[in-house]
Every structure is written in C-alpha cells, then in structure tokens.
Amino acid sequence: MHADLAATTSREDFRLLAAEHRVVPVTRKVLADSETPLSAYRKLAANRPGTFLLESAENGRSWSRWSFIGAGAPTALTVREGQAVWLGAVPKDAPTGGDPLRALQVTLELLATADRQSEPGLPPLSGGMVGFFAYDMVRRLERLPERAVDDLCLPDMLLLLATDVAAVDHHEGTITLIANAVNWNGTDERVDWAYDDAVARLDVMTAALGQPLPSTVATFSRPEPRHRAQRTVEEYGAIVEYLVDQIAAGEAFQVVPSQRFEMDTDVDPIDVYRILRVTNPSPYMYLLQVPNSDGAVDFSIVGSSPEALVTVHEGWATTHPIAGTRWRGRTDDEDVLLEKELLADDKERAEHLMLVDLGRNDLGRVCTPGTVRVEDYSHIERYSHVMHLVSTVTGKLGEGRTALDAVTACFPAGTLSGAPKVRAMELIEEVEKTRRGLYGGVVGYLDFAGNADFAIAIRTALMRNGTAYVQAGGGVVADSNGSYEYNEARNKARAVLNAIAAAETLAAPGANRSGC
C-alpha cells in the first residue's frame, strides 16, 4: 500500500466549509490495488460494533465500482419504547425522545454537508446515517392491527452516524479514507481541533491498512443446512388458501405472506458474508454489526438482496419494481428460452404491471406532478441464480421533500406486502405468527448530502446469540397453490441458509476437519 499522507482537504478549505456546515469530510487517497474489500474491512473494522461493509454486484456477476467500509460510528439513532434514543454522543439540537423519524430528519438537516459540486471527487457515500428500518416501522406510517408476537424485540430502526468511512475504488485500485469532522456543539470554537482530529483518524486508518493479516485462504463444502421452519407445509398451505379466499372476495389483488426459518450457529458473520459473496452475488451485499446500549454487538445483519426499495440522487427518486421470476438455465441458450417464456407469461406480466403502478403511486406522493415516469418497462435482468422482470420508475422530488420522504412514501415495498398495500398488510398481520422485524424492511443509508440508497431486506440473515433468523415468502394471487408457495419461500431462504451451513465448514487448506 502506498499513501500520500497529506489530507486531500486542506486546513484552509476545511475552515471555509466548516463556517457553513457542521459535517466536513476530510479525505486521503491511498493506493491499495492488492487489498480486497474484505481484507480492508478486517483491518479497519475488525467486526467491531457499529461497523459495516456495503458492496454491489451488477446483475449478480461483475462487481460495481465501489465498496464501502464503515470503520467508526460514535453514535447511533434508534428507537426504544416508541421514542427516539441516541446510543452515544448526541449532536447539538438533535431531538432526543419523540418521533424517531422526525428526529432522523432533523439530524440530517443539522448535519447536511456541502453539495457534490462544492466537493468534487468524493465517493458516492462519504458519510451519513447507515443502518436499517425494520418492517414494523410501517406501524408509524399506517394504522395496522397488532396481532403478531414481537418475540425478537428488535428496534424499529437503527442508523449509525458513520463518521469514518473507507471507499474502495475497484476501477482505480485505490481506497479513499474519509474522516468526517462533526461539529457536535454547533459552535466555531474548535474548528482547528476538529481538523486535527480528523487527520489523526486518517492516520489511524492508514496505519491499520498497512498491517498484515493472517491468511484467510480456506476450503469449504456445502452440507445440507439444519434449520427449523416456523410452519409445516400444511399450515402454510392453509394460510395460502385463506388468502386466496380473501382475494376472491375482493379484499386484495395480491398478498405476500412469509415464514421464518431458524438455524443454530456460532459461525462468524463475516464468513457467512464471504460465502454469500461467492454463491449469491447480488446488487446489494451488506454486513452490519449492530450495537446495543452497552457498546457491544447486539446482532449482525448479513444479506444479499437483489432489490432496491428506493434510491435518491441529486433530487431524483428511483425505484425498480421486480416481479416475475425464472431460475437461470444451465447454458446461455437455455437462458434465452427461459427469458422468452417469462416475457410471454401473462400472469407474471400482470403482477409486474400491478407493482409498477404501485411504484408510480408511491413516488407520486412525494414527487413533482408530471415528473414520475416509467423507463425500461418489463425488461429481463439476470442474477446469479434467477432472472426477473424489472422496470424503472423515477420522479423529481417535490419542493421541500427529502430523501427520507421518498423512503417512507415507498415503505414497505409492494413486493413484500401486496396490493392494495394497506389491506394486504392487514391480512399479513392476521396470518403471520410473529412480527417480521428486519424481513421486508430495508438496509442502506441516508447520506449528509441528501441522497439515499436502500435495499429491501430479503435474502438476509439476522444473527444473534447463537441463532440465525432467515425469513422468506412470496406473492399469493387468485390461483396460488399452497404447497408451491411453501416450496417457493423455502427455496428463497435456502440461499442464505446454505451460506451459513457452508461457512461452518470453512477450514485452512489441509486442515483435518474431523478434529482427530
């Protein structure tokens, strides 16, 4: 690794930016063409609470340009007993208590950075609020019945205030280290100290990247995962039959029930991520170490999601409805035949159109009238194991609307609830035993420049106290079959369950697996 030890942001530029903004990123670019995102994560974050790794594989194959590592978060905003709570330092004037969504929006406004034109060359994510919204956050947006048991007691949201970030540029072979200087007390008394502190944190990150790691080369096998299903095939079939009856009665067009699968495991979450990265690369790959109030890891989130809820970039909101699926073929010729079959399937296309309309309606709530449009309607995208029908819906955020407004307008995804959305969620509450928690929520970020990118939390494991929780479901329509839907949910969960089972077998080459 080679580093230019001078910070890219000069003290003079920092003073100018700090006069108008309470968060100023101080950066340093290092040559790191022999590092991988995983090795950089191990060096910079080392599985500490409040750290993360975010990556993307385009169409399940080639890796996107950027990977992001969260190396430090001095505080996090979460929810306790319905109230906004900070786990750590509280930025001056940031709300404590009250509506957590309002507290989040006020915090984003207080800590807004200069726009990208004022700071050219910054990576797409340089700092912000990174974390998750659980599915049950919807109870703050819609009035739903309260029947499902809250057995995991997860917070409705937790977002890290990510101050120390490393952006891995796969095209250049460089890593941009970012230490965000945060003005915690809202005064200009300690500007030079804040700059010096940011440079010192850059020094710590630079030194960490220069340290060697033990070899992580490993072999693995793919055993059958030992897991427990929340429902039997008969029980799940009865749920599907009930929902089909409700659809026939005109209560909904589609409902998306799900069930949870559990697996006992003490495997390191980073090893599960490593396996997912190989076996199920997806547009949204993530590893988060979620802290508790004691500063320890409460639980880990490991995921490989194919689908965004919404992205916001420079005032434009975009969502990509996905509905319609075929498994990938064994050859390119088989893929072409399966694509033609999917494009000719009237049922799949009708479901896709319904979700596109839902996406248009969601964005229409927060976008300037006349700007919402559908692009690339119903085209095929191939992923590592499946292909989907995908469309793009985009719109310009209205005056006074924010990235958080776009997230809440689209939340939860129609692909995880159904249509009409509120009635579908009411029916879900009738048939699911336990609250969904993370499943059907989102994982991603709201940055300090007003942008956002959130993945739908599917193909995701929540790992806590020796148990991994994986949840999956599928859309039920008028002619759905119970046993088919049960197998569909199980197959969707298997990508992650298989990764956990494989991670348990990781061993150095030549190691004796039997222990003899």
From Swiss-Prot:
Keyword Amino-acid biosynthesis: yes
Subunit relationships: Heterotetramer consisting of two non-identical subunits: a beta subunit (TrpG) and a large alpha subunit (TrpE).
GO MF terms, alphabetically ordered: anthranilate synthase activity; metal ion binding
Name of protein: Anthranilate synthase component 1
Gene name of the encoded protein: trpE
Cofactors that this protein relies on: Mg(2+)
NAD listed as a keyword: no
Species, as recorded: Mycobacterium tuberculosis (strain CDC 1551 / Oshkosh)
Purpose: Part of a heterotetrameric complex that catalyzes the two-step biosynthesis of anthranilate, an intermediate in the biosynthesis of L-tryptophan. In the first step, the glutamine-binding beta subunit (TrpG) of anthranilate synthase (AS) provides the glutamine amidotransferase activity which generates ammonia as a substrate that, along with chorismate, is used in the second step, catalyzed by the large alpha subunit of AS (TrpE) to produce anthranilate. In the absence of TrpG, TrpE can synthesize anthranilate directly from chorismate and high concentrations of ammonia.
